[in-house]
Each structure stands twice: as structure tokens, then as C-alpha cells.
């Protein structure tokens, strides 16, 4: 007779056996420990699962029963109750299957194991979906679950082999990948744990760029504006005729962005893990995302949600670029839904009785033509009238425009610039300038929760942005003359702070403010009609 795992106060009841093992789930991009309690007793035979379960979890009983049978373990005619706690948290998905199977085996005392092994099991997390043949299948959200488990005293994780790479970067946890339930049973039969996964070195960020700035002829003011935007993580709108180079300059941006910090890389990898977008051999994500959206995107795909409350594109772009080409052609409700994540840097997804808050710290890069046909101001090709152009530009509402710090008008490249032998600024040189400005911001905001000038809260503007009397007068005149909003005023200040950082200046100068106002282009979009 094997070891009994129920509480000693019930030791007189030979028909009551109890076990407890641990699994986990994701809440947003955070993990949560789940206790899997199993009670086996005399009574009407059956396998009952309780604990606020989605249908995918309720179906686990049949999957586990078949997987155990096909691995050589037949369940006796007993009443088996499995409780997943805490009971007030909804459990969804098939990631609890392995833990449920282990709990049943322990509760039935199917194998005789030592006290030492049982204690080790209590410090082990079990994850994985089971196929009917006993195959252990991969799951989503491994990284945040393992991270949470490590912080709660777990020292070993049994998980699908495909999920081992992403989990291996969590310190002080032994990762034991398995591909079949038979490997899990060998723990009880032989007292031997599966072989540990050997973590590979974290790959360095790739130096490969989509487009090098040096390949773009002319457009020096546009390049400067893009450098400022990236340095301070400011939203940017590129406006110009078709073929002027808007999409090309947007594709330069990933190559000039600063590298991800460890914390940013961890957060981004958790996001992609929860979304199920990490490759089986993938470790940490080391490059900033560049998410280019299709014009037929739905609001759910953009913000997140759906049946599994998956992260949307605004979350997948965290730390990187969210690119919307032909911005006015997107559905109006999609454009307007960007208001809240652009302002708050988070997005809340609600489903049933649960809501999840995901990060949405992206840099919006948008592009549009001057008019519906795309040829304005070339009147030989463009036949749009002023009313049509104005209507087209106003598809982007004032509240959205107010959240865009830099609005660049891009003119077609002249013939002389196109064939000039003079080489423009390269992406490498641009990145060096951005890194210098980034280092100044890191030094300035070292103890803050925000990292970039564009993220300075309104309540801390005076602390980090100081203006002389002359500058305040200029801003007051502009504020009153252009009917600038309060939001726009503070965004100009943040932009001026970034321009000063690019120039290596501690104090904001008159030229910095004037340049910020130029790039803000408050009278846009109809000032040239």
C-alpha cells in the first residue's frame, strides 16, 4: 500500500484520500498560482471538476482519463473530485491537464513513493495540455506563469517541451520539459525527474535594419523630425503625396530605436507568450516590435479581447512601433478607439465577469496622403476640390490629432537630391544621436515609473521642464493665437525637452520651443488649402 496524502486528522477514514499539487494560469500578462486538489472516496463513480471552470477545463476529465488509460493507468471505480482554487477566479484553457492527472495519481495512491519525493512534488509546478494518447501539448502564457511560480517558492516546473525555451530564463527554477505523460509517470515509478533544460545564451539584438536612412535622398527635415520622435517616443504623422517616401521613412524607425532593456524584454516576451506568438525555440524577444496594421483590422484585433481575451495590436506593439499607413482609410471606430491607449498607455479588456489590463506603450507612426487621390499638390494629376480635401483630412478627428506630437509634411524629392552624390545621415549615425538623448532621459527619470519625455505626467511637468520668461510669453502667444488645447500645450513642452536632449542641452532654449511648435504644426491640416 502506498503513502496516503490526506490530512492526518482524517487518518481513521480509509475511504478518504486527498492530494494537492500546483498549476497556474495567466491574468493579463501576469501569472497566478492555482491549487489542484483531488479527493478520492467511495460513492457513485465519476470524475467531477469544480472551481469556476470554463468548458475547456470541464472537458479535462475526459482528456485526462483517456491519456492515463493510454499510458497504462486505468482509473478505478471511485468518486473523484478535483477542485481548482481559488474558486473566485475563472479558469480557462487546457493547461491544467497534467496537474489534474498527477493529482489523481497521488490521491489514488497508485504508486508507492517516498516522503522526500512527495515533498519535492509540493515544490513543483505542473503545466500542459494532454492529448488522448498521452502526448503533452504546448500552451500559451508559460513565461508569466513560471515567473509567478518562482516568486512563490516553486523550484521545479514540469511543462511541454515546446515551452521550455521561454521558461528557461526565469532564475532559480529547474525546467523539466516532457513530451508524453509516460515521462511524468516515471517520476513516480523510478523516482527520477525528467532531464533539465539547458538554457541557451540570450541572443544579442540584431543590427539588421529594414531600410537605412542613408538610402533616403533629401528629406533632411523629415529625418530630423523622425529622430526627435524616436528619441522621446513621440507619436508622429507623416503627410505627403503618394511616392514621397512616407512608408520608406517609417520602415527606417525600427533600425534607429534604442535596444530593449532587460525589463522591457521580459515584459514584451510575456506579452507574446500570452498571445501564443512565441516560436517553440524562442527565448527572450530582443528587438522592438514593428506592427504594421491592415486597413480592414477590427476593433477587437486592435485593442484585444475575443474568446480568450488575447492581447491586441496596441499591446503587441509595446516598446515599439504601431504603424498605420493610409491612416484616414481605417474605419472611424478603429481610429477613435486609439484615444484611450494613446493617452493612458494601457488598455483594459473585459470578458464575462473578468477584466484584464494590458500595457499599450507604443509609438504611433501614421502616414496619409494630402488628398483622396494622393496627388495633391500636383494639380496636373489631382482634381480634388478644397471641400473633398478638407473632408478627407478631417477623417482623423481633433482628439486623435491632439495626441500626435509631430506632424511632418513631406514634399516629393527634387531631381537634384534624388541623384546627389552626397550621402545623407545613416541609421547608425541617427541611432547614436538617439542613444545620447536616451541616456539623458535615463539619468533624469532614473527613479520614476516612466522612461521617455513623452510620458512625463502633467503633474511633473514643472519639475522636469523649466522655461524662462521669454519662452513662456512665446508659448502663451501661440496658445492663444492657434486655439491650442491644454493637452497640446503640455505636449509641446515635452517635445521641446526632447529637442534639447538631442542637442545635449540641460536648459530648453528659444530655438527648441520654436522647433517644437514647427513640428507640432498646430494649424494643420488645412493651412495649405
Show the residue positions of the predicted features.
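Conserved alpha-helical scaffold flanking the Walker A/P-loop in AAA+ ATPase domains
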Residues: 227, 289, 300-322
Amino acid at each position: 500500500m502506498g503513502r496516503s496524502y490526506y490530512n492526518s486528522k482524517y487518518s481513521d477514514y480509509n475511504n478518504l484520500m486527498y492530494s494537492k499539487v500546483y498549476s497556474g494560469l495567466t491574468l493579463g500578462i501576469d501569472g497566478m498560482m492555482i491549487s489542484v486538489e483531488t479527493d478520492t472516496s467511495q460513492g457513485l463513480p465519476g470524475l467531477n471538476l469544480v472551481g469556476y471552470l470554463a468548458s475547456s477545463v470541464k472537458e479535462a476529465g475526459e482528456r485526462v482519463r483517456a491519456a492515463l488509460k493510454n499510458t497504462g493507468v486505468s482509473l478505478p471505480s471511485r468518486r473523484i473530485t478535483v477542485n481548482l482554487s481559488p474558486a473566485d477566479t475563472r479558469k480557462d484553457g487546457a493547461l491544467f491537464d497534467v496537474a489534474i492527472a498527477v493529482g489523481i495519481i497521488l490521491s489514488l495512491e497508485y504508486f508507492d513513493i517516498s516522503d522526500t519525493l512527495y515533498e519535492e512534488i509540493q515544490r513543483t509546478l505542473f503545466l500542459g495540455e494532454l492529448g488522448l494518447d498521452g502526448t503533452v501539448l504546448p500552451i500559451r502564457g508559460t513565461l508569466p506563469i513560471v515567473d509567478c511560480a518562482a516568486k512563490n517558492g516553486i523550484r521545479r516546473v514540469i511543462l511541454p517541451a515546446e515551452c521550455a525555451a521561454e521558461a528557461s530564463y526565469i532564475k532559480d527554477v529547474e525546467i523539466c520539459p516532457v513530451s508524453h505523460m509516460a515521462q511524468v509517470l516515471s517520476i513516480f515509478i523510478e523516482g527520477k525527474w525528467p532531464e533539465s533544460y539547458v538554457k541557451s545564451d540570450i541572443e544579442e539584438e540584431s543590427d539588421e535594419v529594414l531600410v537605412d536612412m542613408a538610402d533616403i535622398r533629401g528629406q533632411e527635415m523629415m529625418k530630423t523630425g523622425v529622430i526627435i520622435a524616436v528619441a522621446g517616443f513621440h507619436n508622429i504623422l507623416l503627410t505627403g503625396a503618394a511616392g514621397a517616401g512616407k512608408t520608406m521613412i517609417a520602415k527606417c524607425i525600427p533600425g534607429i530605436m534604442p535596444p530593449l532593456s532587460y525589463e522591457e524584454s521580459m515584459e514584451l516576451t510575456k506579452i507574446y507568450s500570452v498571445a501564443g506568438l512565441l516560436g517553440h525555440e524562442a527565448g527572450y524577444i530582443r528587438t522592438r516590435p514593428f506592427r504594421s496594421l491592415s486597413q480592414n483590422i477590427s476593433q477587437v484585433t486592435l485593442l484585444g479581447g475575443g474568446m480568450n481575451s488575447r492581447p491586441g495590436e496596441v499591446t503587441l506593439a509595446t516598446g515599439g512601433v504601431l504603424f498605420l499607413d493610409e491612416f484616414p482609410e481605417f474605419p472611424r471606430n478603429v481610429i477613435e478607439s486609439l484615444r484611450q491607449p494613446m493617452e493612458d498607455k494601457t488598455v483594459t479588456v473585459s470578458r464575462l465577469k473578468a477584466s484584464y489590463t494590458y500595457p499599450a506603450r507604443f509609438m504611433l507612426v501614421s502616414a496619409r496622403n494630402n488628398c483622396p487621390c494622393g496627388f495633391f499638390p500636383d494639380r496636373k494629376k489631382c482634381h480634388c476640390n478644397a471641400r473633398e480635401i478638407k473632408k478627407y483630412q478631417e477623417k482623423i478627428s481633433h482628439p486623435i490629432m491632439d495626441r500626435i506630437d509631430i506632424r511632418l509634411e513631406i514634399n516629393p524629392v527634387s531631381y537634384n537630391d534624388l541623384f546627389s552624390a552626397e550621402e545623407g545621415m545613416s541609421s547608425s549615425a541617427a541611432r547614436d544621436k538617439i542613444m545620447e538623448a536616451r541616456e539623458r532621459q535615463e539619468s533624469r527619470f532614473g527613479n520614476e515609473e516612466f522612461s521617455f519625455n513623452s510620458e512625463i505626467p502633467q503633474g511633473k511637468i514643472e519639475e522636469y521642464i523649466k522655461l524662462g520668461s521669454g519662452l513662456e510669453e512665446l508659448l502663451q502667444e501661440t496658445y492663444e493665437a492657434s486655439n491650442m488645447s491644454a493637452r497640446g500645450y503640455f505636449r509641446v513642452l515635452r517635445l521641446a525637452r526632447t529637442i534639447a536632449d538631442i542637442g545635449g542641452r540641460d536648459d530648453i532654449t528659444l530655438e527648441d520651443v520654436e522647433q517644437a511648435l514647427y513640428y507640432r504644426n498646430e494649424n494643420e491640416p488645412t493651412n495649405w488649402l
